């Protein structure tokens, strides 16, 4: 059942905090893989199922009727994020008229329910625990930084400078190839304005930015 209110969603998220993955999976009749090598998205799927998310990988938010996106965030023993966070695929073509205000990235990040999860590899997957939920909305200053990065990165795409894009660009957002392998090509714009085959690119939040969100929450300013 999909939660009908923000309060109901938060209550569900708080109810699973502290559970081991094995306990939660068992209650949902989901098998636990031995590790995440072949099942990279399993943790996200486990949490989505537990909370009743509906969108899957569609462009809309996970809880579209509440205007909330769901993100699992693996952290280490010190409470620091272990990986970057995928936000959405970048539009490599037909991006005329796309602005920050009507972008998928802004839409997805307008309100996020972060679910912290233990992510250290030495902890067996079944023994890892679900952590606290954090309901977050970007501050005006955070949105400004996101917008600045998004506009800079989109400029590279629209000007056909795909080969110049690398993971060092952007202070809080980065663009990286998104695909299981290099055979998963899509269409993009080349440097002379021609259509080319290229790797799909995804927008990711840097670990430093998600660490800042966690810090904000711990200090009670989030």
UniProtKB/Swiss-Prot annotation:
GO cellular component term, pick one:
cytoplasm
- Leader sequence residues: none
Among SUPFAM superfamilies, the record links this protein to: Restriction endonuclease-like (SSF52980)
Per UniProt, subcellular location reads as: Cytoplasm
GO MF annotations, alphabetized: DNA binding; endonuclease activity
Please give the Pfam families that the UniProt record associates with this protein: MutH
* GO biological process terms, semicolon-separated: DNA modification; mismatch repair
- Report keywords, A-Z: Cytoplasm, DNA damage, DNA repair, Endonuclease, Hydrolase, Nuclease
> What family does this chain come from, according to its entry?
Belongs to the MutH family.
Functional summary from the UniProt entry: Sequence-specific endonuclease that cleaves unmethylated GATC sequences. It is involved in DNA mismatch repair.
Any idea what this protein is called? DNA mismatch repair protein MutH
Q: Which organism is it from?
A: Pasteurella multocida (strain Pm70)
């Amino acid at each position: 059942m999909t939660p009908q209110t923000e309060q109901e969603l938060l209550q569900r998220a708080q109810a699973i905090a502290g559970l081991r993955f094995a306990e939660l999976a068992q209650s949902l009749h989901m098998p636990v893989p031995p590790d995440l090598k072949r099942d990279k998205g399993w943790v996200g799927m486990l949490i989505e199922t537990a909370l009743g998310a509906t969108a899957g990988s569609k462009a809309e938010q996970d809880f579209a009727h509440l205007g909330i996106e769901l993100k699992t965030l693996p952290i280490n023993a010190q409470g620091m994020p272990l990986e970057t966070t995928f936000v959405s695929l970048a539009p490599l073509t037909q991006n005329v008229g796309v602005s920050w205000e009507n972008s998928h990235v802004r839409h997805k990040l307008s309100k996020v329910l972060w679910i912290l999860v233990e992510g250290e590899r030495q902890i067996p997957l079944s023994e890892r625990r679900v952590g606290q939920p954090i309901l977050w909305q970007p501050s005006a200053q955070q949105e400004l930084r996101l917008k600045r990065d998004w506009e800079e990165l989109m400029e590279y795409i629209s000007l056909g400078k795909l080969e110049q894009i690398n993971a060092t660009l952007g202070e809080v957002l980065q663009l990286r190839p998104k695909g299981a392998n290099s055979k998963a090509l899509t269409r993009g714009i080349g440097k002379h304005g021609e259509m080319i085959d290229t790797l799909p690119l995804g927008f990711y939040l840097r670990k430093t930015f998600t660490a800042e969100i966690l810090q904000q929450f711990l200090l009670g300013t989030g």
